[in-house]
A protein has these predicted regions:
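Sec-type signal peptide cleavage vicinity
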Residues: 3-8, 16-361
Length: 361
């Protein structure tokens, strides 16, 4: 078995600014308490051209050397931003971000609009403001949040059934190898961000909110049969740890903790709770049936690529690598194939590639 670590290659960045009128070069325009906090945004992908007609960020398929590009969804991506220092009772606002479709690179936003016009984050009286952001703001995944002192607590629900939203096929012109990519549900690709800014120092400058991966992602490749005359139709894939005490998904609480005032950095930390015990969350099920209720047929010189989203390592939220033995049950039109004890070294909160052996007909 082979496994390759792939760092997630995109940091979602939001720029914030205060409302301001036109001013001359000799005048300053400090942000005033009560002004609305206005958002603009970018995804830091570097240069990335739209390829193969893919016009959505709900796909990881186009792998590049240094990571996986991410684009804004043309129909909009929903994010939540929390600011405990915001004026009044409104401490959270949800936004719809859309790309600038007039450009070739869709990492630039064309618009950032409030989902609820009544939600308005306003600059508070304090100079320092702390911003906590979440993607997605989907209520079925990001269930709730609470401000407790300097921290923000939230509850995450990561489902055991992780069906794709569609499929994308690409053929390599040189090798003629065809890859069938799952288009995953990006609601499972949870991210978070934190930053602290000072009103007195802002004055028109943008504020970066660099999103970090929250969940751990398995990028799984299943090669087709070795014999050129064989084919296998895959209907469903179930992933489970061989150690039944391990839980891959479920409901769990997390806390974003800003650095202490004496810290020599401004990097927030994360504290996680143990997921609520649930037998069903000890495995992940991924359907490979298309919209016509047909399974994915995998031939010789073809391969299938799917994603699975796991809870991050609970004991110590960091980028440590841990070893986990996984079992894969692949349901085909003929039988259920089981691949046991696949030793996998997983780096927490990153995209980890796993290559399985050729599927047998």
């Amino acid at each position: 078995m082979k496994k390759q670590l792939l760092l997630a290659g995109a940091a979602l960045t939001l720029g914030l600014a205060g409302c301001s009128d036109d001013v001359t070069e000799n005048l300053s325009n400090p942000i005033q308490t009560g002004e609305e906090i206005v958002f603009g945004s970018t995804i830091n992908n570097g240069e990335y051209q739209k390829a193969n007609g893919i016009q959505t960020k709900t796909i990881y398929a186009e792998r590049i050397d240094h990571g996986i590009p991410v684009l804004w969804d043309p129909e909009g991506d929903e994010i939540a931003i929390v600011c405990p220092q915001a004026l009044g009772n409104t401490k959270r606002a949800d936004y719809l971000v859309k790309p600038d479709t007039t450009t070739t690179n869709w990492n630039q936003s064309g618009s950032v609009a409030k989902l609820d016009p009544s939600q308005t984050l306003k600059w508070g009286e304090e100079d320092a403001h702390k911003f906590f952001a979440f993607y997605p703001q989907n209520a079925s995944i990001l269930k709730d949040y609470a401000i407790e002192g300097e921290n923000v607590n939230f509850t995450i629900s990561l489902p055991a059934t992780q069906n794709p939203t569609g499929w994308h096929t690409k053929t390599d012109e040189n090798t003629q190898e065809t890859t069938i990519y799952e288009i995953p549900n990006m609601d499972y690709a949870l991210m978070w961000a934190y930053n602290k800014v000072y009103k007195s120092k802002l004055q028109g400058k943008s504020i970066d909110l660099d999103f970090k991966n929250f969940v751990t992602v398995l990028d799984i490749t299943i090669p087709g049969p070795k014999n050129e005359h064989d084919a296998v139709t895959i209907n469903n894939i179930v992933i489970s740890p061989t150690d039944q005490s391990q839980q891959l998904t479920g409901d769990f609480k997390a806390t974003i903790i800003p650095p202490s005032p004496t810290a020599h950095h401004d990097i927030a930390s994360m504290k996680l709770s143990t997921p609520t015990p649930n037998e069903a969350h000890r495995q992940i099920s991924i359907s490979c049936v298309n919209k016509d209720n047909q399974g994915i047929t995998l031939k010789h010189n073809e391969k299938l690529v799917i994603k699975a989203y796991l809870c991050p390592k609970i004991e110590n939220y960091n980028l440590d690598t841990e070893k986990i033995n996984l079992s894969f049950r692949i349901s085909t039109n003929k039988e259920t194939l089981t691949i046991n004890h696949v030793p996998t070294h997983i780096t927490n909160s990153k995209v980890n590639r796993i290559l399985l052996p050729n599927i047998k007909p």
